[in-house]
A protein has these predicted regions:
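Short alpha-helical basic/polar micro-motif
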Residues: 197, 360, 364, 539
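Conserved beta-strand segments of alpha/beta enzyme cores
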Residues: 106-108, 159, 177, 518
Length: 566
């Protein structure tokens, strides 16, 4: 594990912002590191406002999309809302279909079967639309590369509106409208929206056309916040505003489906991390284990008792998903060892009976042990399909592009992607991918990194600091929970390991003459010897509040621990 202290901004910038906000220098440092350099920046950051959302008509083709939907309503056409089977796709379909149904009855939804149809727009879905009299399909979280599919639909006189956030290819599909802030010819001010976020901009534009206010659309933000959390997009700009108000909806008046999911886990107040680890996996489990339609049913259900029934079924899917995840991860580790591939620059594994719904999770698990770009393949029909996950700084999408001659199709982002290939090309691809990674990955990318925001003393940890850090929420990419470093720390004699395998570490630490403070380090049990014999050591940690028997105290959430000589 390597520790990297983020570059410190100039002293002039720090002093100027610290004085303007009446905060300590290191708090000003945290803000500048997040792009907050002026009083107005800080005001917008700490006080998100719906007024900060951009005009949806700034997005390329938004006027065309709205005009086509309004024409469909005027002509009593049937509209099919189509989306991917993951959290971003199912929340987007739920959002757009629910909004349209509140104005117009001829709306239906379609989620492709993960195993029968695969990712994105499918020919089977277009045939379904044709057979059932749909003349307009709104595709969410997919479609930006579906050139052949859109052409096929056009032959059947079916129009497409694409709402996507993935990188476009060199050629765009021949759709009526393509809403994607990553289009090169799109001047929309913010290009980090998720698929559900693009869907929200569509209903915002439709609402604006109908003289609805942005406040009228707030009830839909529980869906948007869930998608933002699940899709791991930056929590900056519009995403911060949408996530901030979406969390308020989740914690005050969520839709029955989300309320039922929260009810399952019996947690009173959820933050963005809870959405990532509690709500998102359960919504995802429907598409992974059964069918994404189950998630849409849950998220669009108005009756709470019925929603509870749906949530109970999804809870079972999630339990099944965990069992599969555990088994396949174990088998993948065995394969790496048997093939003596521990020292490779990439991980590429395959087994034909691995469940396609969990291979992305398994890829992430493998990276925790073998920190390198990872692809997990399984059999899908007569082809092999994989999920890819990457390590910080390495663009797995570009690596796949470099090996495209061996692939049938691929798509995704810098850190996560999916692909299919012919069985006979698997070994050729595996070696080509290894060669590409070996030649392009930087040495430091092969070691997990802890990015430290600032070095502080325990005396800096005050109630005021805790209050300020709470206002940094919601956390996420480009606004991660601040990580601090403190040196010359000693344990007060209470160090112990926790857990059945003694894998966790519990400390009560001091620095010089400071008051003692509790610290917990998950997975750090093996480092307990560093804390013994009155040794001084260094901690990397984030700050949290621990509530016990009605008392609230500050606790260090340890990221790592190392000797003071480093």
């Amino acid at each position: 594990m390597r520790w990297t202290l983020k570059p410190k901004p100039s002293e002039d910038k720090i002093k100027h912002l610290a004085q303007a906000l009446n905060v300590e220098d290191f708090v000003a440092t945290l803000l500048i590191q997040r792009g907050i350099e002026t009083f107005d920046d800080a005001k917008n950051f700490f006080r998100p406002s719906l007024e900060h959302l951009h005009d949806p008509f700034l997005m390329k083709d938004m006027d065309k999309a709205v005009a086509r939907i309004e024409l469909a309503i005027e002509n009593h056409e049937n509209i099919l809302v189509f989306g991917d089977y993951d959290v971003d796709g199912t929340t987007a379909v739920s959002l757009v279909s629910a909004y349209l149904k509140s104005h117009y009855p001829n709306i239906a939804t379609y989620i492709p079967d993960r195993y029968d149809e695969g990712y994105g727009i499918s020919f089977k879905g277009i045939d379904f639309a044709d057979d059932n009299g749909f003349s307009l399909i709104i595709a969410l979280d997919c479609g930006i590369k579906s050139i052949d599919h859109i052409a096929y639909a056009k032959e059947k006189n079916i129009d497409f509106i694409i709402c996507d956030h993935h990188r476009p290819g060199n050629i765009l599909p021949d759709a009526v409208a393509i809403l994607d802030p990553k289009r090169e010819d799109c001047d929309y001010p913010y290009d980090e929206l998720c698929g559900c976020g693009v869907g929200f901009k569509l209903i915002q534009a439709l609402g604006k056309n109908r003289n609805e206010t942005i406040e009228d659309l707030v009830p839909y933000l529980d869906l948007v916040a869930t998608a933002i959390a699940a899709d791991i997009v930056p929590i900056t700009g519009e995403n911060r505003v949408l996530a901030y108000f979406g969390l308020q909806v989740i914690n005050s008046d969520p839709r029955p489906g989300i309320k039922a999911l929260v009810h399952q886990v019996k947690k009173k107040v959820l933050d963005i991390t809870d959405v990532v680890f509690i709500i998102s996996p359960r919504i995802n489990a429907a598409g992974r284990i059964k069918h994404g339609n189950h998630a849409v049913e849950l998220l669009t259900e108005f009756n709470f008792e019925q929603a509870q029934q749906f949530a109970s079924e999804i809870e079972q899917y999630n339990s099944d998903r965990k069992d599969l995840d555990k088994r396949i991860t174990k088998e993948a580790f065995q394969q790496i060892l048997e093939n003596q591939e521990e020292e490779r620059f990439s991980t590429v594994v395959f087994q034909e009976d691995w469940h396609k719904g969990v291979i992305g999770i398994v890829a992430s698990r493998l990276i925790e042990t073998y920190y390198r770009p990872t692809l997990v393949f399984t059999k899908s029909g007569d082809k092999y399909a994989a999920s890819a996950r990457s390590v910080k700084g390495f663009d797995v999408y570009n690596a796949l592009d470099a090996c495209a001659e061996h692939l049938e199709q691929f798509g995704g982002h810098m850190y996560a992607a999916g692909m299919t290939l012919k069985a006979e090309n698997y070994l050729l691809f595996k070696e080509a991918f290894e060669k590409c990674v070996k030649e392009t990955i930087q040495p430091e990318m092969r070691t997990p990194e802890i990015e430290i925001d600032a070095e502080i003393n325990f005396s800096d940890i005050t109630p005021k600091l805790i209050r300020i850090l709470k206002q940094f929420e919601p956390f996420g990419p480009q606004n991660m929970t601040p990580v601090f470093m403190t040196t010359n720390v000693k344990d007060t004699g209470y160090a112990k390991t926790l857990g059945a395998d003694e894998e966790h570490l519990r400390l009560f630490v001091k620095q010089n003459n400071s008051e003692g403070i509790a610290a917990i380090g998950f997975g750090l049990g093996k480092k307990i010897d560093i804390t013994k014999n009155q040794n001084t050591f260094q901690l990397a940690y984030s700050l949290a509040e621990n509530e016990w028997n009605g008392n609230v105290s500050t606790q260090l959430m340890l990221k790592d621990i190392r000797t003071n000589e480093k």
